[in-house]
């Protein structure tokens, strides 16, 4: 989250991958959005911007679980371990739901390549 939006580098990468329109790298590829920020609501606004961008790119979005993680020192260790049991459980549940979402999308909108 940068000033309640997505980082410029991420936006630039999405812009490049979104061409040509209609046959871009995101078309029919399921997406889920997770974010963290030191403030309590910064990631929520940034995620809404990202959802709008991905919708324009024709990427089906999982909206049933929204993931707003308040980042605090020590939440993630140097080796990538999530120290909070509740956060780890939430992320595991989120990924299980996302896996099911991918399967549902692939049933309705099979990817051609």
Residue ranges and their predicted role:
Residues 60-113:
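Glycine-rich phosphate/pyrophosphate-binding loop and the adjoining helix
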Residues 1-58:
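Helix-loop-strand module that forms the ligand-binding subsite of alpha/beta enzymes
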């Amino acid at each position: 989250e940068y000033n309640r939006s997505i980082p410029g580098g991420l936006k630039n990468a999405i812009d490049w991958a979104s061409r040509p329109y209609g046959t871009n790298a995101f078309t029919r590829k399921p997406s889920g959005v997770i974010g963290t920020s030191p403030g309590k609501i910064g990631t929520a606004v940034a995620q809404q911007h990202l959802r709008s961008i991905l919708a324009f790119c024709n990427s089906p979005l999982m909206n049933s679980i929204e993931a707003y993680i308040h980042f605090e020192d020590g939440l993630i260790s140097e080796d990538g371990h999530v120290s909070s049991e509740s956060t780890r459980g939430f992320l595991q549940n989120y990924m299980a739901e996302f896996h099911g979402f991918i399967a549902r999308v692939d049933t309705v909108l099979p990817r051609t390549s």
